[in-house]
Amino acid sequence: MSIINTSYVEITTFFLVGMPGLEYAHIWISIPICSMYLIAILGNGTILFIIKTEPSLHGPMYYFLSMLAMSDLGLSLSSLPTVLSIFLFNAPETSSSACFAQEFFIHGFSVLESSVLLIMSFDRFLAIHNPLRYTSILTTVRVAQIGIVFSFKSMLLVLPFPFTLRSLRYCKKNQLSHSYCLHQDVMKLACSDNRIDVIYGFFGALCLMVDFILIAVSYTLILKTVPGIASKKEELKALNTCVSHICAVIIFYLPIINLAVVHRFAGHVSPLINVLMANVLLLVPPLMKPIVYCVKTKQIRVRVVAKLCQWKI
């Protein structure tokens, strides 16, 4: 399929890429990709179902975990249409409007996930540092308020992205470097001044960096507090809970950092590596986090096993 590349016609369609150099194998590559999407959606859906149907899990930590699962579902479903259209149907083109909408949801759910991980770190710090006041501070109403505030904050932060991208002119190139639309990828194709997008994109990245720093501070304080717990059993329980949260933080932020490095040195990195890193960013975290929480959180693991046994009977 020929790709339009002209300086005379304003472009309204973008072309996404699958695996550069492996186009002949896209149908086979779609099998593991579809499997990963399916596992991620089923895994996060299971987490939500277990927490909703089990009254003993109706507590602040599990409500925040539900928010994390919902943001992972949103992230998976946002990228699903273009990824499947490329690998299953060999249809890499997408309209500019669809592209701008997709990057809004991808970035929005990414920022929301970062916010939820920050909330969860504060939740664990409060539970360990001040356990007697924990339930009185984090009431169900307050948890709902926190969730609503951070959801609005996340979406408002990325709301300008589609509008600033739409205000740009695209008249030279129209091929993106990923299987889905990202703000930093689209703005590079503009043939008009994109300084506003560069500055605002940097501001968005800075917000994620602040979240990461605050999360690191929270868990550092937790690790300092844990040795002071009188009961060895409670100390191990607190550490075990924190380990699952720390794993979730690493799973989320590590691909983002790697992709940022790849974008920074894009001229020295093969297009295949670029695409692989981008797919890891959106496929692996939603896939791995339900597994981590099922393995490391006994309350969820026991309920999942019980439900599976119940359905088998």
From Swiss-Prot:
Transmembrane segments: 28-48, 57-77, 102-122, 142-162, 199-218, 239-259, 275-295
Positions on the Cytoplasmic side per record topology: 49-56, 123-141, 219-238, 296-313
InterPro entries found in the cross-reference section: GPCR_Rhodpsn (IPR000276), GPCR_Rhodpsn_7TM (IPR017452), Olfact_rcpt (IPR000725), OR51/52/56-like (IPR050402)
Membrane topology of the entry: Multi-pass membrane protein
Extracellular face of the membrane: 1-27, 78-101, 163-198, 260-274
Record keywords: Cell membrane, Disulfide bond, G-protein coupled receptor, Glycoprotein, Membrane, Olfaction, Receptor, Sensory transduction, Transducer, Transmembrane, Transmembrane helix
SUPFAM superfamilies membership: Family A G protein-coupled receptor-like
GO cellular component: plasma membrane
Main location: membrane
UniProt-annotated location(s): Cell membrane
Gene Ontology MF terms: G protein-coupled receptor activity; olfactory receptor activity
Domain of life of the source: Eukaryota
CDD domains recorded: 7tmA_OR51-like (cd15222)
Disulfide-linked positions: C99-C191
Glycosylation sites: N5
General function of this protein: Odorant receptor.
Family, per entry: Belongs to the G-protein coupled receptor 1 family.
Full protein name: Olfactory receptor 51A2
Lineage: Eukaryota, Metazoa, Chordata, Craniata, Vertebrata
